[in-house]
Curated annotation (Swiss-Prot):
Source organism: Bos taurus
Gene Ontology CC annotations of this record: extracellular space
Protein name as it appears in the record: Pro-adrenomedullin
Modified residues (Tyrosine amide): 146
Residue ranges annotated as propeptide in the record: 45-92, 153-188
Length: 188
């Protein structure tokens, strides 16, 4: 009774592993692909060679100016085919041609809608910020005023408390940006 399940298991695994371990004929598949590529290349070269100028009138028309830059070429120019007559027909990446045609329409920076909203909010903030005064009124800075400066100026502030470091001196000619103002306020 136990021999039947073991035999079935053995035959099943042999059939399964036999399929996986079968040798693939890689050389035959490669040969097929190579022949297909060579045939298509031969047809392409035949078409291109028939389109070359052969008459004297075509030569007198003048040289044809190509619009191919060295960085647009897909392959390296050191290939053995570079000296052949079809070297003039170099394949070019298509997206570069389309980008070069529309250079005036390109804009730098973020193109997402969220970036546009953020830029607009930033511009509105800067336009409305020019009317604001950067310094506090004198009545609030005095020792009778309120806030952190009053607490610092009171005599009992030094008992048992450590004060923050004084602000660093500003560099001459450096712009007084919002970030520096916030940092200076936090250090006071």
């Amino acid at each position: 009774m136990k021999l039947v399940p073991v035999a079935l298991l053995y035959l099943g695994s042999l059939a399964f592993l036999g399929v996986d371990t079968a040798r693939l004929d890689v050389a035959a598949e490669f040969r097929k692909k190579w022949n297909k590529w060579a045939l298509s290349r031969g047809k392409r070269e035949l078409r291109e060679s028939s389109s070359y100028p052969t008459g004297l009138a075509d030569v007198k028309a003048g040289p044809v100016q190509t619009l191919i830059r060295p960085q647009d070429v897909k392959g390296a120019s050191r290939s053995p085919q570079a000296s052949s007559p079809d070297a003039a027909r170099i394949r070019v990446k298509r997206y570069r041609q389309s980008l070069n045609n529309f250079q005036g329409l390109r804009s730098f920076g973020c193109r997402f809608g969220t970036c546009t909203v953020q830029k607009l909010a930033h511009q509105i903030y800067h336009f409305t910020d020019k009317d604001k005064d950067g310094s506090a009124p004198r009545s609030k800075i005095s020792p009778q005023g309120y806030g952190r400066r009053r607490r610092r100026s009171l005599p009992e502030a030094g008992l048992g408390r450590t004060l923050l470091q004084p602000p660093e001196p500003k560099l001459r000619g450096a712009p007084d940006s919002r970030v520096h103002q916030v940092l200076a306020t936090l250090r006071i």
